A protein has these predicted regions:
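Boundary/entry segment of secreted carbohydrate-active catalytic domains
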Residues: 20-55, 213, 294-316, 325-329, ...
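Catalytic domains of carbohydrate-active enzymes that cleave complex glycans
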Residues: 114, 143-145, 151, 180, ...
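Metal-dependent polysaccharide deacetylase catalytic core of the NodB/CE4 family, i.e.
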Residues: 25-129, 147-156
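Well-ordered, non-membrane alpha-helical segments in soluble/globular domains
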Residues: 29-34, 61-70, 134-138, 161-172
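Secretory targeting signatures
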Residues: 1-25, 339-373
Length: 373
């Protein structure tokens, strides 16, 4: 076989191997920069990351930073902060390399099949089954531990197959006395509550909340504390002397405010703020307790939208719902590339054997002619 023929055969054989690199031409889900995304943020949803469609994050670390950049170019992560902090990985163990890449990109929460992760990453577990019809488990959600976060799995499509949601379970969840939240909101609400302290001077209690988060994209999530004391409350004001919003106890979405509870008050306030509680009488004894769950509700629920490549398709069944979602955004394949890849693969399957046979026959004819001469 001649040198040029050998090179051509090698090139033909390599074509199918090299062809998948076309998939690097990624698409953009423009719904992320539409009114749909804005509405979901207003409801309280969070946008996290899950890498690039068809790419295993554990094998290709570059998708971690790339997914963050892709998401930030389209929308902010939450009403509480710009940068995404939640990352979905379909792996039980996150090694040090992946962990370092996640932390370097600002991610702080991983889930929801993860069982082991390096220090600096919090794990959100899948403990609420799914919203898929036939898989949803009301009893599992109902048996959740007090003050825990229940993560319910949701994926609108698997390939071209549309997944049906369980409308009865959705309606049931909406009726429960639970806090509708997200991975990031739940995580930072706890942290803000822990970093809140209270002091008393005569008949005035000062409640101060500090923030551990810094930077332009950092999340600033309110925290909740219960402050116990004996005297009755005259009023609750912010640092500017304005009355704090009064909560009724029926709110299920995180909001700043306060309400009376047995033996004191429950206050939810923004980080880096001060709240003043004026009492009828003086006191020198108070007790402060951070509350893990907003409004002192039973437990918390978030619906986790996995492999979200098209926000419209993933949200279309939940218009008007009170549920709050943690959307794990995945950058999709370019639609044009989607149909080109199978066509290219089929062409190679047909063309390569035919070309090799043709070239071999051409070599045989050439060798035969040389022998005759």
């Amino acid at each position: 076989m001649g040198k040029s023929t050998s090179l051509l055969v090698t090139a033909l054989i390599c074509l199918p191997i090299l062809a998948p690199t076309v998939a690097a031409d990624w698409g953009t889900d423009t719904w992320l920069s539409s009114v749909i995304a804005e509405e979901r943020l207003d409801i309280g949803d969070e946008f996290g990351c899950q890498g690039f469609e068809g790419v295993e994050t554990t094998d290709e670390q570059w998708v971690i930073a790339a997914c963050k950049e892709y998401l930030e170019d389209q929308t902010k992560a939450s009403r509480w902060g710009k940068s995404p902090i939640s990352f979905g990985i379909d792996s039980k163990v996150i090694d040090e390399g992946i962990g370092d890449a996640l932390i370097k990109s600002g991610f702080q929460i991983v889930g929801d099949l993860v069982e082991e992760a390096p220090e600096g990453l919090s794990i959100a577990i899948r403990n609420g089954a799914s919203l898929e019809k036939g898989v949803a488990d009301k009893n599992l959600i109902e048996s959740a531990e007090e003050d825990s976060l229940v993560s319910v799995h949701w994926r609108a499509r698997i390939g071209d197959l549309r997944v049906r949601e369980d409308k009865d379970v959705i309606s049931w969840i909406e009726e429960q006395p639970v806090w509708f939240t997200t991975w990031g909101e739940w995580h930072f609400h706890r942290a803000s509550g822990i970093s809140t302290s209270a002091s008393v001077d005569g008949s005035t209690i000062t409640i101060e909340s500090t923030s551990q988060q810094i930077g332009s994209g950092a999340w600033q999530v309110p925290g909740t504390v219960m402050v116990e004391f004996e005297p009755s409350v005259v009023g609750v004001t912010d640092a500017e002397g304005l009355p704090m919003p009064l909560l009724t106890g029926s709110e299920r979405n995180l909001a700043v405010g306060w309400r009376n509870v047995d033996g004191g008050v429950m206050v939810t306030q923004n980080p880096n703020t001060s709240v003043y509680v004026e009492l009828e009488d003086t006191t020198n004894q108070i007790e402060t307790t951070p509350l893990p769950t907003f409004n002192d509700l039973n437990y918390s629920v978030t619906i986790v939208g996995h492999h979200t490549t098209n926000l419209f398709r993933w949200t279309q069944d939940f218009s008007g719902t009170e549920l709050v979602f943690t959307w794990l955004i995945e950058r999709p394949f370019n639609d044009e590339v989607g149909w080109k890849l199978p066509l290219l693969a089929m062409t190679m399957l047909i063309a390569v054997p035919i070309s090799i046979v043709y070239l071999l026959r051409a070599d045989q004819i050439s060798a035969s002619n040389n022998q005759e001469h």
